[in-house]
Amino acid sequence: MQGNGSALPNASQPVLRGDGARPSWLASALACVLIFTIVVDILGNLLVILSVYRNKKLRNAGNIFVVSLAVADLVVAIYPYPLVLMSIFNNGWNLGYLHCQVSGFLMGLSVIGSIFNITGIAINRYCYICHSLKYDKLYSSKNSLCYVLLIWLLTLAAVLPNLRAGTLQYDPRIYSCTFAQSVSSAYTIAVVVFHFLVPMIIVIFCYLRIWILVLQVRQRVKPDRKPKLKPQDFRNFVTMFVVFVLFAICWAPLNFIGLAVASDPASMVPRIPEWLFVASYYMAYFNSCLNAIIYGLLNQNFRKEYRRIIVSLCTARVFFVDSSNDVADRVKWKPSPLMTNNNVVKVDSV
């Protein structure tokens, strides 16, 4: 799902340098983007995990996948991105073969883990709204943990072939050890199809079914019995949809470039502008810091918990405590249902 790279066979080889013809400001710009991404990624996703841990209103089956997605985003900020940053500062990779392979492997683990978790979230929302009578049984705490474990096992199975296929290589254009699209056309096409296009189709199907059902319910119910969809409920549903849309926008260019390269590597690689290739990569990198921002902007429960955690840190209070016992939160919280003649249609909260 990533770029056309240059081989780095072993740690004893000379350092691979970037293209000397590049403008001097480019490396600085890429470094600034990456530093911002790393800082926001780490702080934001730690806030997400702590928010779910502290607040009972956020501790539900759907948010198990949200925490799992936050972990996937954290993976790249903790190890691969700092190594890419060092490569930018050194104008080449001088960390050796092992770090290159581990960095590329963890990047793949993060992106595929992210898309599989986003798919899991979409399926969870679909079951919650379209099959609500079966939801509690399908998504018990035990089952939800099993689903998350399955997601990571599938992610691991999807990434491991990269180590044996020799597709993890250093690319000086992006200062990263990454998936080389030109090594095997068939393998690259398979990666894009099964690790991006198929999950995207599943997610689109789930969200389309949700919107269709909600619209049908609103049209069928008599005016005096028409269910009220609270603004907060609508925002909670839209939050995860926005997460999906931004992920698709950030990663689609890189995947379509991969398909183009795989179709005819010899002729397509020289025809892809370097600026487009680099921009598509760093746009994909940038996506890892967006989710926590989305939750804070669109979800009131997360926004309040972010504020509590920050205040706790600033006042040196212990923040590993259950904040849902606050006076304002003692009223029992329930998602408001949408009733139909033969089923219950609910709008879940993140």
Curated annotation (Swiss-Prot):
Tissue: Expressed in hypophyseal pars tuberalis and hypothalamic suprachiasmatic nuclei (SCN). Hippocampus.
Residues the record marks as carrying a glycan: 4, 10
Membrane topology, record value: Multi-pass membrane protein
Disulfide pairings: 100-177
Ranges of the Cytoplasmic topological domain: 51-63, 124-142, 209-240, 296-350
Amino-acid positions noted as binding melatonin in the UniProt annotation, renumbered to this chain: 162, 181
GO biological process: adenylate cyclase-inhibiting G protein-coupled receptor signaling pathway; circadian rhythm; G protein-coupled receptor signaling pathway; G protein-coupled receptor signaling pathway, coupled to cyclic nucleotide second messenger; mating behavior
PROSITE patterns per the UniProt record, alphabetical: G_PROTEIN_RECEP_F1_1, G_PROTEIN_RECEP_F1_2
Function according to Swiss-Prot or TrEMBL: High affinity receptor for melatonin. Likely to mediate the reproductive and circadian actions of melatonin. The activity of this receptor is mediated by pertussis toxin sensitive G proteins that inhibit adenylate cyclase activity. Possibly involved in sleep induction, by melatonin activation of the potassium channel KCNMA1/BK and the dissociation of G-beta and G-gamma subunits, thereby decreasing synaptic transmission.
Protein name per the record: Melatonin receptor type 1A
Gene name of the encoded protein: MTNR1A
